């Protein structure tokens, strides 16, 4: 599990270094046994240690004494429960993706890389407050037959 925690940290730091998310925004998780490992709430990625990565069960249970998961843990849980093939989730707040998502429309197949999302477009999940079941439902709908979506 230590190696997987280190991988979560490595890619979390890349959110910042690759300018995909600023400071503490975004979150990353990786499926692990009967749950997943996820970045903690409000943590500065450059300072993360293995012990900071939080384990959340697929039932949504976690030990608060060991850390508080990202406020977006619920949609990670729902994706892992509904998409058995999902092994990891990256939720970034890039300037471009954020700008596009504010229009509430997906990305059409203007480039062959769109197909990497699993379809002929990238869907945009309908807006809902962060951390809610409603947001999870909207994300799952946007992910039908897809590997990626805008939020």
Question: Where are the language model's segments positioned?
Answer:
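Glycine-rich flexible loops
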Residues: 1-151
């Amino acid at each position: 599990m230590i190696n997987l925690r280190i991988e979560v940290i490595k890619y979390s730091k890349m959110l910042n270094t690759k300018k995909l998310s600023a400071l503490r925004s975004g979150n990353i998780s990786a499926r692990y046994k009967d749950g997943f490992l996820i970045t903690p709430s409000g943590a500065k990625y450059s300072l993360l240690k293995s012990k900071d990565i939080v384990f959340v069960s697929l039932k949504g249970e976690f030990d608060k004494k060991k850390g508080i998961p990202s406020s977006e843990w619920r949609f990670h849980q729902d994706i892992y429960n509904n998409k058995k093939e999902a092994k990891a989730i990256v939720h970034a707040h890039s300037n471009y993706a954020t700008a596009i998502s504010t229009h509430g429309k997906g990305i059409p197949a203007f480039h062959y890389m769109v197909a990497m999302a699993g379809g002929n477009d990238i869907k945009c999940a309908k807006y809902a407050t962060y951390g809610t079941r409603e947001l999870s439902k909207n994300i799952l709908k946007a992910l039908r037959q897809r590997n990626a979506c805008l939020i």
